[in-house]
Structures are given as structure tokens and as C-alpha cells.
Amino acid sequence: MNSIKFPVLDRTTKNSVISTTLNDLSNWSRLSSLWPLLYGTSCCFIEFASLIGSRFDFDRYGLVPRSSPRQADLILTAGTVTMKMAPSLVRLYEQMPEPKYVIAMGACTITGGMFSTDSYSTVRGVDKLIPVDVYLPGCPPKPEAVIDAITKLRKKIAREIYKDRIRPQQGNRCFTTNHKFFVVRSPHTGNYDQELLYAPSSTSEISTETFFKYKSPVSSNELVN
């Protein structure tokens, strides 16, 4: 049944009895029906959209795009991920049921791309937010490369043991860099204290000696000293 990696059909048995394990049966059913959640933010996602056409026909892999994270088991991130979008991406990943997989598509998603040099708001790699199963480099990668990444993910699922995958997630989830996001009050509320904004500056607290000291001209000798 599992035609990707291990043949689970025992040909020595009679009467065409199929013998397999529950783990292989689960892997075979999941690799043949991946439901991706498309998270496209930039030009790399246009290349993935080419797979929907009849030329590449990604339906043969059982891919059914979903619009809800609770119905998806694969999230494909394509494009630049900013600091403002990072909490939304993490929330979508957390809402996906287990087991779930991630494909990072494009240089901007993997390393930040050309925006990682002088941009203060770009995440330098989506693996700092969520764990990535398959990296797909390119700017942008071709549709054939996307098919190859999906094939590699199917091979990974075929030889996967479910208990080994959920065990690290039950412990401490630690990635390369922890981005700490805190919900703070917006500073632009429109309610400002008008008395503080338009209060005239008072010089009554400045002493007379200090006022005339800095008002008088300073000689060159005093500047050197």
C-alpha cells in the first residue's frame, strides 16, 4: 500500500491477504491526501499558483487547498514574513491539527532574502517561528521544484513514526531564535493630555547664576580647558 518507501504487501501469503501495520497505513493515507493551507505573501506564490493548471496538475498528488487551518495538515509559506505578520502565522500553525507539516518556499521565507540586509521588520527565516520540514530555495522556485519538494515530503511521511514526531512537541518547543511578542496598548489612541502638550516652558526653576553663566560668551581658553 505504501508505494513511496516500503512495500507493505506480503506476497508470500495466500488468498491475496494484505498485511500491514497501523503506522504504515496511517502514513500511506496521509501522504496521499495532503491538504495544504496556502500562506502566500509575495511573488513566490505565483509560481505555486501555476501548479493548479492542467500543465502540472498537482491534483494527482491528492492536494486539496483549504482555507481553514483546522482542515489542513500542510502549510506552504511563500514570500516575505514580517514581524507584524509573524503572530498570525504562528497562530495559524497552532490551529492546525496534528500531524502537520511546513514547506518553506523561496529565499525570502527561508532567510529573509534581499530584505534581510537593511530591513528592521523582516523575519530572518520562518524557522525562527515554526518548525520547517522541507526547504525550497529559489527566487522564485520553479513549479517543478515545488513538485520535487512535495515528493520529498511524501517520502518523509512514508518512513515516519507518529510517536517519534509528537514526542518532541510534547516537551520544550525551542527553535533557532525565540521571537517574543507581547500584546501592548496602542500608543496612538488619540487621547492626549492637552495641558502637557501645550504647556508653556517655565524658566522659574532655573537659577539666575546658571542662566547668566550659559548666556555669557565663552572664551577660547575655557573651551580648551
UniProtKB/Swiss-Prot annotation:
Places the protein is found: Plastid, Chloroplast thylakoid membrane
Subunit structure: NDH is composed of at least 16 different subunits, 5 of which are encoded in the nucleus.
Lineage of producing organism: Eukaryota, Viridiplantae, Streptophyta, Embryophyta, Tracheophyta
Catalysed reactions, as listed in the record: a plastoquinone + NADH + (n+1) H(+)(in) = a plastoquinol + NAD(+) + n H(+)(out); a plastoquinone + NADPH + (n+1) H(+)(in) = a plastoquinol + NADP(+) + n H(+)(out)
GO MF annotation terms: 4 iron, 4 sulfur cluster binding; iron ion binding; NADH dehydrogenase (ubiquinone) activity; quinone binding
Encoding gene per record: ndhK
Function of the protein: NDH shuttles electrons from NAD(P)H:plastoquinone, via FMN and iron-sulfur (Fe-S) centers, to quinones in the photosynthetic chain and possibly in a chloroplast respiratory chain. The immediate electron acceptor for the enzyme in this species is believed to be plastoquinone. Couples the redox reaction to proton translocation, and thus conserves the redox energy in a proton gradient.
Protein name in UniProt: NAD(P)H-quinone oxidoreductase subunit K, chloroplastic
InterPro entries: NADH_UbQ_OxRdtase-like_20kDa (IPR006137), NADH_UQ_OxRdtase_20Kd_su (IPR006138)
Disulphide bridges: none
One GO cellular component term noted in the UniProt record for this chain: respiratory chain complex I
Organism field: Nasturtium officinale
Keywords, comma-separated and alphabetical: 4Fe-4S, Chloroplast, Iron, Iron-sulfur, Membrane, Metal-binding, NAD, NADP, Plastid, Plastoquinone, Quinone, Thylakoid, Translocase, Transport
This enzyme's EC code(s): 7.1.1.-
Protein family per UniProt: Belongs to the complex I 20 kDa subunit family.
Any GO BP annotation: aerobic respiration
Membrane topology recorded in Swiss-Prot or TrEMBL: Peripheral membrane protein
Cofactor(s) the protein requires to work: [4Fe-4S] cluster
Residues binding [4Fe-4S] cluster: C43, C44, C108, C139
Cofactor: binding comment: Binds 1 [4Fe-4S] cluster.
